[in-house]
Amino acid sequence: MAKNKSQYDSTLNLPKTLFEMRAGLPKKEPVMLKDWDDNDLYNQLMKHNEGKPQFILHDGPPYANGNIHMGTALNKIIKDIIIRDKNMEGFQAPYVPGFDTHGLPIELKALSSVGDKKKDISKLELRQICEKFATEHIDIMSDQFKRLGVIGDFEHPYLTLKPEFEARQIEIFGEMAKKGYIYKGLKPVYWCPDCRTALAEAEIEYGEDDCDSIFVRFHVSQDPNGVLAKHGIPMDKTYFVIWTTTTWTLPANEAICLNGQFEYSFVKIGDEFHIMATELVKSVMDACHIENYEIVGEPVPGTEFELMRYNHVDLPKEGWVILGDHVTLESGSGCVHTAGGHGVDDFNVCQKYPQVPITVPVDDGGYLTELAGKYAGQRVWAANKTILADLTESGAVMGQVHIKHQYPHCWRCHHPIIFRATEQWFCSIAKFREDVYKAIDTVTWMPDWGHDRMKGMVRDRNDWCISRQRTWGVPIPAFYCKKCGTYHITDATIKAVSDLFRKEGSDAWYKYEAEQIIPAGEVCEKCGASEWTKDTDIMDVWFDSGSTHAAVLEERPELRFPADMYMEGGDQFRGWFQSSLLTSVASKGCAPYKSVLCHGWVVDEQGKQMHKSAGNGVEPSEIIKDYGADIIRLWVASSDYTVDVRAGKNIFKQLSEAYRKIRNTARFILGNLDGFDPNTDCVADDQLQEIDRWALAALDDLMVNTSAGYAVYDFNKVYHAVYNFCVVAMSNFYLDVTKDRLYCTNGAGRKAAQTTMYKILVALDKIIAPILCFTSQEIWDFMPKTEGMNQYVVFEEMPKAGQYAADEAFKAKWAQLIAVRDEVKKVLEQARAEKVIGASLEAAVTLYCNDTLYSLLNSIPMDELADLMIVSHVELVKGEGGAASAVEGLGVAAAHATGEKCERCWKYSSSIGSHAAHPTLCARCASVVEA
């Protein structure tokens, strides 16, 4: 306490603790982790909470192909805070981490690892390399998660490559197929030419690309309904005008689609006539920079043009004019270029016209085939320019402009993708969409906008393409009749494949011939033959992870279906949240989760996306090295994670300062609990001073706020409540006011303060335990224990509000006392500025009060009131006087205290020298020293 050495320093009860001011988390945390591993903390915790109600947070499996990043850290720490809190709130909350282990990224890594040999290795060999790669990264990522303080069954995670998982996935597929939800058909799907596979909607990301927006005219060749003749328009000089931004699809054009509800006009340019929607004539002419044109005759309903024919612009074939409701007046010409092999709307409308073929002149790698004529061999992106140049030269292009637009890209390789009609396996969403809507309504969505978002996505989505033309994944369990080619899936074949996979894993599909897998006696339903081949596709990885409700929740004895919560980032509305919902509703008729909690993206300090190329990223390993994992955990808790969360070195530096204030509050209390035995030294409530009761009431308010925050997963509320309690209520007020009692006395007053502080620290440490898992345990290790307290703080129950609650009258009284204290501090500052006093203990304060305020202040003993103001003397005077204040009925005057300064407590007193043996001490300090 004293800056200069005094002979009485040793008689003071100065704080003493081995709990360090400098956290040293980067070094301490690994030591704690080893202790947790050595003592099997997770399984101990589960055993400790055995028999309690369960809370199941089901882990969405991260992809096992690299180091974790800040987004992964955010996700896992949110989950861990929830798990730790629930285990302290009267639940048994197991956490089984999972890993998504199949899919293209791992397959590509495996292929790159073998170099030139990739053409020579078998599918089975490739799969074995993939499995080794995935397994290695599971170990790496598990260690990184544990370094963040994440507690869970990392010794027994669920893996989508495990035989028992794959077997259950096959059964889910079979259940859906039995209900008629699985079918194979030709449809346009997202196709990545670089990865050479179909993609699901969840595997698409949008980016800005350049393209040519062009208006192209197609010459009318046949008018079977005599529409042109009826309106006096010469057929040999008449064209339909279409608009497109995908020039490479023109070789696949087989139709031009009009809307039967729209009217179309003949637009004369020179001596030629051009058909387009009447409402779009001006916008088309403006886009084509054509000023001299004339609309000839009256508008014609779109229906009159149906089944007219036209010549293809660049290939020796004719197309059909057809009608479709998807044609709009929002852009273009009202005449839509239709290539059924390269667009969903195009494909669907062509299905209504059997005479219109579905042409796909593009191969797996994105190269045009012989169906594209002279463009064969060109990749679609290069063909854009070649085709445009030829059409421009032939006069088919009416207008052209270079634009930037949002275009779909593959989320794996980040290259542009195409729509391409291929034979694929689909899940028919339309057949159970209404059931999905009902399931969505049963779920609690957090934030609540998740309900409408999910419902909108399900409403707008097409059938789910679940097949992939790759090797590393769970095979589609279908057989084909060698004689007629019909696919064959029955209960018996599903059971045979499932049993085989459960025994040997899905590699068995590649080890055995079809006849060795399919049950004896199976015959083709169409032709009666019994010779078979196997399907060569694998399932979409979203079907893998979407099956965890069956393969994990239903299979693991410590878990149950449905889960209480799924918690992931917002991108999972079209990913895991949705695939899990679809497979669960399709197979079980209900949602796999009771609630869904969603978090945002991690962005840099300016709110921009993090990219390696931009150099604006920050890695968890860097922050752990500099500050420790608890600072990352504090970052998570301090953020509103329902929106995008900012991260950067400056932010973590600021958080380390906030952390230090929380830590130092605990350290101060621990220092003042030196020698305190809560089993024998705690005093009864009636021995507490009134300010002690105020501190406990403030603690009770903290419990109310933090309990409310944890209940709705608002950890930001918990953090701010804890921070304000530590800084404002404790450090700036209560702990400051009680220093004299703690340092200078040894009696009941000191024990009352210690009792209060002990209760505060025990509760505070439990409150912060889910967030600051390392620091809370360190505090717990240094804390004096009572009988029955556990070795680990996470085994404790979260403190319940109400035990220290104060009534409104008490709260109002202390709000008034604190307001008076604030006014006194202002006057003391003025006295200090005028050199009347130095430290506040040099002051004597006179408080001029009205009757009401006098009565309130006089209810506090004067020595306690002086401690409250941190002055040597306080005098109460009824009436007016002193400096006016913001408190009604209060005036404040400050003067230098009379008497002399006590060498031990620094208070001014007239009793200095009253004890001959201690002439420099006040009477109180002399009696303490002599005791």
Task: Identify the function of each model-found stretch.
Residues 192, 410, 481, 524-527, ...:
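Short cysteine-rich clusters marking metal-coordination/redox-active sites
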Residues 47-109, 242-251, 257, 322-349, ...:
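N-terminal catalytic cores of NTP/NDP-binding nucleotidyl/phosphoryl-transfer enzymes
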Residues 2-25, 31, 35-39, 111-251, ...:
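Residue patterns forming the tRNA-binding/recognition surfaces of aminoacyl-tRNA synthetases
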Residues 196, 469, 485, 528-529, ...:
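Cys/His-coordinated zinc-binding microdomains
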Residues 222, 319, 353-366, 470-472, ...:
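Alpha-helical recognition segments enriched in aromatics with Gly/Pro capping
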Residues 100, 189, 193, 199-207, ...:
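Acidic, turn-prone loop/beta-hairpin segments
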Residues 189, 407, 478, 521, ...:
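Residues immediately within or flanking Cys/His clusters that coordinate Zn2+
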Residues 49, 53-60, 71-74, 78, ...:
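Secondary-structure capping and boundary motifs in well-ordered enzyme cores
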